[in-house]
């Protein structure tokens, strides 16, 4: 089994996070609540230095956005955030929740003013580009629930006894005599929060071109995240790197959609050949 040094065990960037600590909820706008985590913590550990082998975004959905209009009347909306993969930091989710809660008793003259505030604060925290889409209640009716595209591999009748993360499940997992272009998905992705060890439930889509991947070995690999502690974004980048390394995919997209916590869901998207389409939630989100 591959043994990896824990890149987070002595990471000073994690010491000051509010995650896992008792906190007070602020009802007045406070941008200082936002906390970033350097992406380099994970990327250095999986040899992602220099030019990255993918592009993409961390796609967040905020379901509990509320503020006051100029007359003091409460307003609500859903917000969709696209944070560039190139940002220096990812945004820590609990701090994001606390930050959004701080809008609850804060007046904004317009949705445009609210949107500009969100973009300015989040881009400053992440040290990168972010776009923000505000979905008003009049558009709630067109919000869709979908299934991930591709063939689901969860019905494979396998016996599992080891739930420790192990990329070696992908060793010798391809048939070099068959080159395919296919899309697979699984709803069995589960990892744990890096700080609190709370379960993070997700679904993942893998679209690739290259030697055909043994689906049973791929499923065992995905299941091995079950007791693995890492942030959502880091898990997706780890999956991408492992598939490139072991399966020699010539084209690859890894897209995970995690269930929401604190009114937020996180949906990391990484690809070396395509861009994310429209973001639609899954049934568990």
UniProtKB/Swiss-Prot annotation:
Signal peptide: none annotated. The keyword Transcription regulation does not apply. Its main location: cytoplasm. InterPro entries: GTP-CH-I_C/QueF, NADPH_dep_7-cyano-7-deazaG_red, QueF, QueF_N, QueF_type2. GO terms for cellular component: cytoplasm. The keyword Metal-binding does not apply. NADPH binds at residues 93-94, 261-262. It is an enzyme of class 1 (oxidoreductase). Substrate binds at residues 91-93, 232-233. It is found in: Cytoplasm. GO terms for molecular function: preQ1 synthase activity. Pfam families: QueF (PF14489), QueF_N (PF14819). Pathway: tRNA modification; tRNA-queuosine biosynthesis. Its EC number is 1.7.1.13. Transmembrane segments: none annotated. PANTHER family: NADPH-DEPENDENT 7-CYANO-7-DEAZAGUANINE REDUCTASE. Belongs to the GTP cyclohydrolase I family. QueF type 2 subfamily. Catalyzes the NADPH-dependent reduction of 7-cyano-7-deazaguanine (preQ0) to 7-aminomethyl-7-deazaguanine (preQ1). Homodimer. This is NADPH-dependent 7-cyano-7-deazaguanine reductase.
């Amino acid at each position: 089994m591959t043994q990896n040094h824990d890149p987070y065990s002595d990471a000073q960037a994690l010491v000051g996070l509010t995650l896992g600590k008792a906190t007070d909820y602020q009802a007045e706008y406070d941008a200082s609540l936002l906390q970033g985590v350097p992406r380099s913590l994970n990327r250095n550990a999986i040899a992602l230095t220099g030019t990255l082998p993918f592009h993409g975004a961390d796609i967040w959905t905020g379901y509990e956005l509320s503020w006051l209009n100029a007359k003091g009347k409460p307003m609500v909306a859903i917000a969709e955030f696209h944070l560039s993969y190139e940002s220096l930091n990812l945004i820590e989710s609990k701090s994001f929740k606390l930050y959004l809660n701080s809008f609850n008793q804060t007046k904004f003259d317009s949705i445009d003013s609210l949107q500009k505030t969100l973009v300015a604060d989040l881009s400053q925290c992440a040290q990168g580009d972010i776009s923000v889409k505000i979905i008003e209640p009049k558009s709630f009716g067109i919000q869709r629930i979908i299934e991930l595209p591709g063939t689901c591999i969860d019905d494979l009748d396998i016996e599992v006894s080891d739930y420790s993360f192990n990329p070696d499940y992908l060793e010798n997992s391809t048939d070099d005599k068959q080159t395919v272009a296919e899309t697979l998905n699984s709803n069995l992705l589960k990892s744990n929060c890096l700080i609190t060890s709370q379960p993070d439930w997700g679904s993942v889509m893998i679209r690739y071109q290259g030697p055909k991947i043994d689906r049973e070995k791929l499923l065992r690999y995905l299941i091995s995240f079950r007791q693995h502690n890492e942030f959502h974004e880091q898990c997706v980048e780890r999956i991408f790197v492992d598939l490139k390394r072991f399966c020699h995919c010539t084209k690859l997209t890894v897209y995970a959609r995690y269930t929401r916590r604190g009114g937020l869901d996180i949906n990391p998207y990484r690809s070396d050949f395509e861009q994310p389409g429209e973001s639609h939630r899954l049934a568990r989100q």
